[in-house]
């Protein structure tokens, strides 16, 4: 959900990045990502939580998250499903993730 400019009172937190997954672990990575997204989307303060594959290279997975606040993101990091997901990463990923955190104070629809 893209929040409109009027809806952004405090900084919304956006997390965006990518990671390369192991070819032999792709099916397991998809299952883990789906479970993580399902659990995370139920969290208070989560506006969006998505994984997607690169169209040119299906071993590259993108992550996009939107959080109402830094506090909501911190609560997310302390959840049992986050701990379980992080514990699975070594068997799923082929290298370090490139992930950025953005603090957004305004947003407007394009076009």
Label each PLM-derived region with a short phrase.
Residues 2-13, 51-59, 87-111:
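Glycine-rich beta-strand-turn "strand-cap" elements at beta-sheet edges
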Residues 13-51:
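N-terminal first-folded block
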Residues 13-20, 50-77:
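Short, well-ordered beta-strand segments in beta-rich or mixed alpha/beta enzyme
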Residues 20, 24-27, 31, 58, ...:
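Residues at secondary-structure transition points
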Residues 35-47, 66-100:
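An amphipathic, aromatic/His-enriched active-site/gating alpha helix that lines ligand/cofactor pockets
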């Amino acid at each position: 959900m893209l929040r409109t400019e009027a809806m952004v009172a405090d900084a919304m937190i956006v997390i965006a990045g990518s990671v390369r997954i192991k070819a032999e672990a792709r099916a397991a990575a998809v299952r883990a990502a789906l479970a993580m997204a399902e659990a995370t989307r139920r969290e208070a303060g989560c506006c969006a939580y998505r994984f997607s594959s690169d169209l040119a290279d299906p071993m590259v997975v993108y992550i996009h998250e939107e959080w109402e606040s830094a506090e909501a993101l911190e609560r997310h990091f302390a959840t049992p499903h986050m701990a379980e997901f992080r514990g699975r990463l070594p068997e799923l990923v082929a290298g370090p993730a490139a992930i950025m955190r953005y603090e957004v104070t305004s947003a407007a629809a394009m076009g």
